[in-house]
Curated annotation (Swiss-Prot):
Its main location: membrane. Keywords: Cell membrane, Germination, Membrane, Transmembrane, Transmembrane helix. GO terms for biological process: spore germination. This is Spore morphogenesis and germination protein YwcE. It comes from Bacillus subtilis (strain 168).
Amino acid sequence: MMDMFFAYLLVASATPLFIWLDNKKVALSAIPPIILMWVFFFFYATESLSPLGHTLMIILFAVNVIVAHIAAFIIYGLPYLRRKRSS
């Protein structure tokens, strides 16, 4: 589980850079959860994360995955559907 979390953390950290030109608001809104995930990862790596902290870390991870998919749909899916509908 932690390997998957760390891999996602690295990808999520770069995501605002990829979407900056398409939607600055979405890119900026992605930064606070990324910072929180790095904080949780630091506590996990130093073995000072409580069971509640583990639970919050997994919840934050799941929420961030869901928000990232919604953002991807808003940025890339909706314009595609609008172009398809108008033609």
